[in-house]
């Protein structure tokens, strides 16, 4: 028996090579390994670093239900070799495991990042044998023993935070105990193995339509936590189950049971799993998200947009609602320029005379809406010092688009010999080079003919499990399309490095870091009620970096000045998506918009380097008070919202400022009209807002 111990960036990992070469992952934590923490140490098939399932091979050991544990040949993979080196990010470790029966090998990678308590995990499966193998599951991250530290049973000490995500109610974290999922601990300690399983999955092309591809596990006894994100723009899966007296966490991309995915590996073929990043903390959720935020900045495509954080005006939300005309655009352009916007995006509808939902795909201007052409509008936008943009939806084609009747079926997702469609649209298949060429031609034409520098790339359907045309399985077709789309997107950015493309999917239904490592900006929601939007805004930096999180601000025609302030504060610590009928606001309210944008331009240099904090916790949609902080080395920007309720006073604690000299100011609005005070003794900021539905932006300077 041999041990491999890795200590890197405050992380402790312990692997074991048994005498029969079985490879075990015994420890992953913020503290050194304690052998006594393992209950069922003698179990021969436990603590596997990789779970892999090939069709046609038996599992000799007990498991219950649909757990991806005791997989075959995962249970008898043998250690072969290890490589340990460094690259530009930090240390990188690779283990080679082999199944002697099938001659399938797995290369398991761990990428460390200097100074960060986080690891990116992925696996490459290679068939080095002589027979075709059917791969239907490969873990990206697999760790048994997530409950082993601390003396209390798991159901008394573990809490799971799950980020629910849905249309108009994105980034909605909820906290659960194991008992909430029927996972009470009632079996003998060494034999805990039930059929209960906590699973969070996505099946389809909307990667975040029900949940974000993330999770957080907290051990409340040891005050440690684990935050993970699965980096795939389609189907993914994570599960927590019990086996061998311990709980395990397994995270992966698509699989056969939940995603209709399997892949035939012919001799010599390889398959690379989706990456999973895991951050460990002994300082709480905020610290784990801060680490993840820094990691997300590292893996993201270098781009000017995330350095400049320019302000976008978009004519859709609580404004033109997808029915633009030249006559309506001109006053909006004037008002947006006067307020200080830097991009102006013409949203949906510019390409159709009337109803357009089921006819999209040609992407040519409507002469009825724009008699002198869209170029007249984009030229006017540029004359006002702004960069023009337009809305597109390039992964779909309406069933009544003339092109859809002219191109062959292999342009689209197919199942059972029929085209796949949803909501009167067909799903385009980016594996097809003709589809990619068509998409390129649209991008090229809009840039050359209209001079656009910004594209809002929307996506409003869910094609389900995938396509079985030219694929081993529907899920295989789906994953191959998604990876082809990412490669196409990378090629677009290579051709047009200054082009900004916004990731939108009915709002935030594809918030994942396969997409967001390419896209510089993300639409977070279609939420059209600013009073609810503050919850999405406050929580959004848990899902993506603040400088990628586009938040709508849409002052209403009939509102008052506090309504404007609330709207603006929603967006001021993130990316501003300005909208609303600015030209029709009173001068006082227009001035408040301009004041907010002017202030934003002075603080955005700090936003791109800050990490988020939630001094009173993550927000929920019916909380009376909500706040979000962005912390840098010497200051904290703090957005505070009061909704309805009978509590005009909130005390906001800042334990991290203990024994530090600070000064507090209200940045926005300039008229303030709220009371606030700082207690040096208790490190608490007390804020009083006498009216309901008020918001303010503060700055806490650390001296």
Model-assigned labels for residue ranges:
Residues 2-240, 259, 665-675:
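Polysaccharide-binding surfaces and accessory modules of carbohydrate-active proteins
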Residues 9-13, 28, 485-675, 686-699:
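Active-site-proximal substrate-binding groove within the catalytic cores of carbohydrate-active enzymes
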Residues 10, 123, 268, 381, ...:
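Conserved, mostly hydrophobic/aromatic
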Residues 257, 315, 319-406, 437-441, ...:
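Aromatic- and glycine-enriched glycan-recognition loops and surfaces
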Residues 340-350, 438-471:
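Active-site groove signature of glycoside hydrolases
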């Amino acid at each position: 028996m041999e041990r491999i111990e890795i200590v890197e960036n405050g992380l402790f990992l312990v692997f074991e090579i048994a005498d029969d070469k079985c490879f075990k992952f015994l420890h992953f934590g913020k503290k050194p390994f304690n052998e006594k923490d393992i209950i069922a140490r003698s179990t021969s098939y436990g603590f596997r670093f990789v779970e892999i399932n090939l069709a046609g091979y038996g599992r000799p050991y007990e498991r219950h239900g649909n757990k991806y544990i005791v997989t075959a040949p995962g249970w008898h993979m043998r250690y072969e070799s290890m490589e340990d080196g460094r690259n530009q990010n930090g240390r990188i470790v690779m283990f080679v495991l082999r199944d002697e029966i099938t001659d399938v090998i797995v290369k398991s990678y761990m990428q460390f990042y200097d100074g960060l308590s986080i690891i990116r995990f992925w696996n490459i499966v290679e068939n080095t044998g002589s027979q075709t193998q059917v791969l239907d599951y490969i873990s990206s991250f697999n760790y048994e023993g997530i409950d082993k530290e601390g003396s209390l049973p798991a159901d008394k000490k573990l809490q799971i935070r799950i980020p629910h995500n849905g249309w108009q109610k994105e980034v909605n974290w909820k906290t659960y105990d194991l008992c909430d999922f029927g996972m009470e601990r009632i079996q003998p300690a060494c034999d805990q193995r039930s059929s209960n399983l906590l699973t969070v999955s996505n099946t389809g092309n909307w990667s975040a339509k029900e949940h974000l591809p993330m999770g957080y596990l907290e051990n409340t006894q040891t005050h440690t936590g684990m935050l993970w994100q699965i980096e795939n723009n389609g189907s993914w899966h994570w599960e927590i189950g019990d086996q061998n007296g311990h709980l395990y966490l397994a995270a992966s991309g698509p699989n056969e049971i939940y995603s209709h995915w399997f892949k035939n590996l012919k001799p010599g073929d390889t398959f690379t799993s989706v990456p999973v990043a895991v951050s460990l903390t002994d300082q709480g959720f905020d610290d784990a998200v801060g680490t993840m935020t820094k990691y997300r900045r590292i893996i993201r495509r270098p781009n000017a947009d995330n350095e400049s954080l320019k302000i976008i005006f978009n004519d859709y939300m609580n404004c033109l609602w997808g029915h633009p005309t030249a006559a309506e655009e001109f006053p909006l352009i004037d008002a947006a320029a006067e307020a200080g916007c830097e991009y102006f995006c013409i949203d949906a509808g510019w390409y159709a005379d009337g109803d357009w939902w089921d006819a999209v795909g040609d992407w040519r201007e409507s002469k009825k809406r724009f008699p002198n052409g869209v170029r007249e509008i984009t030229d006017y936008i540029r004359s006002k010092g702004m960069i023009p943009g337009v809305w597109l939806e390039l992964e779909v084609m309406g069933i009544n688009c003339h092109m859809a009747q002219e191109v062959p079926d292999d342009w689209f997702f197919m199942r059972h010999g029929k085209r796949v469609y949803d909501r009167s649209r067909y799903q385009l298949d980016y594996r097809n080079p003709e589809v990619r060429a068509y998409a390129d031609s649209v991008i090229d034409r809009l840039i050359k003919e209209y001079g656009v520098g910004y594209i809002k790339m929307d996506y409003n359907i869910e094609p389900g499990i995938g396509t079985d045309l030219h694929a081993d399985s529907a899920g295989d077709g789906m994953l191959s399309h998604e990876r082809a789309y990412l490669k196409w997107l990378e090629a677009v950015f290579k051709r047009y490095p200054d082009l900004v493309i916004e990731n939108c999917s009915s709002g935030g239904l594809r918030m994942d870091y396969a997409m967001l490592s390419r896209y510089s900006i993300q639409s977070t929601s279609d939420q059209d009620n600013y009073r609810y939007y503050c919850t999405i805004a406050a929580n959004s930096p848990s899902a993506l970096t603040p400088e990628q999180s586009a938040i709508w601000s849409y002052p209403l025609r009939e509102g008052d000045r506090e309504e404007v302030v609330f709207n603006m504060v929603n967006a001021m610590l993130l990316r501003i998506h300005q909208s609303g009928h600015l030209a029709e606001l009173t001068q006082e309210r227009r001035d408040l918009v301009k004041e907010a944008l002017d202030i934003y331009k002075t603080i955005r240099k700090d936003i791109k380097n800050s990490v988020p904090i939630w001094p009173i916790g993550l927000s929920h949609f019916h909380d009376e008070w909500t706040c979000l902080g962005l912390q840098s080395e010497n200051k904290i920007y703090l957005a505070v919202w009061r909704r309805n309720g009978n509590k005009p006073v909130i005390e906001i604690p800042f334990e991290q400022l203990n024994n530090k000299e600070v000064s507090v100011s209200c940045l926005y609005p300039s008229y303030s009209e709220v009371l606030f005070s700082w207690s040096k003794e208790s490190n608490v900021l007390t804020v009083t807002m006498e009216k309901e539905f008020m918001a303010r932006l503060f700055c806490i300077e650390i001296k």
